[in-house]
């Protein structure tokens, strides 16, 4: 986190309409600089100068995906990490098609999704209702399989998060269920992973693990402060924690297990 705050990475967020404000505020809180550029007239230029690119298909359109692919290729040429959040993949054929297109045409550094979304990328049967994926599977094994199949770093989020590059497998147990009651927390996590990847581009597993642990600790601390008040207070306090949390405190509270 100190690296993020010191370097103030520019994160090009091609994210969905529902979460743009929350994503921008969350990235500002951790010390990154968000920019939202969607037009095909400028996405390549913006992706080239940004420190990382987030592609999120929460509110997809054909034109939007065309712009995402242009931006992704530009980020690849510039050597900038691309984070892909396949929101709701598995729910409709359209989301399946555009996810395949992005993965086929863009060199994605990290894929982040819930178990249902990651299973859908592998063509496995799951249940995706809206953007909430539910599947009966070993999340850790799913993560390892997906990383091997997609040949990239995969983050599977859930009660316990998992990160793998196909060889290493790490579990992160931090977090709180109230995150699922605030729209946009999963999408913001993609942006936070992008910020960490921007300052640790050669250690993407470590970047993802540290981002997850930091994010989860912030959620736990926010819950402890607001559990008698409710979700609205939790959301505000969570943003405060993102801005106030130190590496030292997060390190003391993180629950990370290296599985292999």
Curated annotation (Swiss-Prot):
ATP binds at residues 112, 157. Substrate binds at residues 36, 184. Keywords: ATP-binding, Kinase, Magnesium, Metal-binding, Nucleotide-binding, Thiamine biosynthesis, Transferase. Signal peptide: none annotated. Gene3D superfamilies: 3.40.1190.20. Pathway: Cofactor biosynthesis; thiamine diphosphate biosynthesis; 4-methyl-5-(2-phosphoethyl)-thiazole from 5-(2-hydroxyethyl)-4-methylthiazole: step 1/1. InterPro entries: Hyethyz_kinase, Ribokinase-like. It comes from the Bacteria. One of its GO terms (molecular function) is ATP binding. One of its GO terms (biological process) is thiamine biosynthetic process. Its cofactor is Mg(2+). The keyword ATP-binding applies. Its EC number is 2.7.1.50. Disulfide bonds: none annotated. It catalyses: 5-(2-hydroxyethyl)-4-methylthiazole + ATP = 4-methyl-5-(2-phosphooxyethyl)-thiazole + ADP + H(+). Catalyzes the phosphorylation of the hydroxyl group of 4-methyl-5-beta-hydroxyethylthiazole (THZ). HAMAP family: Thz_kinase. Belongs to the Thz kinase family. This is Hydroxyethylthiazole kinase.
């Amino acid at each position: 986190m100190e690296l993020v705050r010191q370097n103030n990475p520019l994160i090009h967020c091609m994210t969905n309409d529902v979460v743009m404000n929350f994503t921008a505020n969350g990235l500002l809180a951790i010390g990154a600089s968000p920019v939202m550029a969607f037009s095909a007239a400028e996405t390549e230029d913006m992706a080239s100068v940004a420190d990382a690119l987030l592609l999120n298909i929460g509110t997809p359109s054909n034109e939007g995906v065309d712009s995402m692919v242009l931006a992704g290729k530009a980020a690849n040429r510039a050597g900038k990490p691309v984070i892909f959040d396949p929101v709701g993949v598995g729910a409709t054929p359209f989301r399946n098609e555009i996810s395949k297109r992005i993965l086929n045409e863009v060199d994605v550094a990290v894929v982040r999704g819930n178990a249902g979304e990651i299973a859908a990328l592998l063509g496995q049967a799951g249940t995706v209702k809206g953007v909430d994926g539910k599947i009966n599977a070993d999340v850790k094994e799913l993560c390892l399989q997906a990383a091997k199949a997609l040949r990239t770093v995969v983050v599977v989020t859930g009660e316990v998060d998992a990160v793998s590059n196909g060889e290493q497998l790490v579990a992160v147990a931090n977090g709180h269920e109230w995150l699922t009651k605030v729209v946009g927390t999963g999408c913001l996590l993609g942006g936070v992973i992008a910020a960490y990847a921007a300052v640790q581009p050669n250690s993407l597993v470590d970047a993802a693990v540290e981002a997850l642990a930091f994010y989860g600790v912030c959620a736990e601390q926010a819950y402890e402060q607001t559990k008698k008040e409710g979700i609205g207070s939790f959301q505000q306090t969570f943003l405060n924690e993102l801005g106030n949390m130190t590496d030292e405190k997060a390190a003391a509270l993180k629950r990370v297990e290296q599985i292999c």
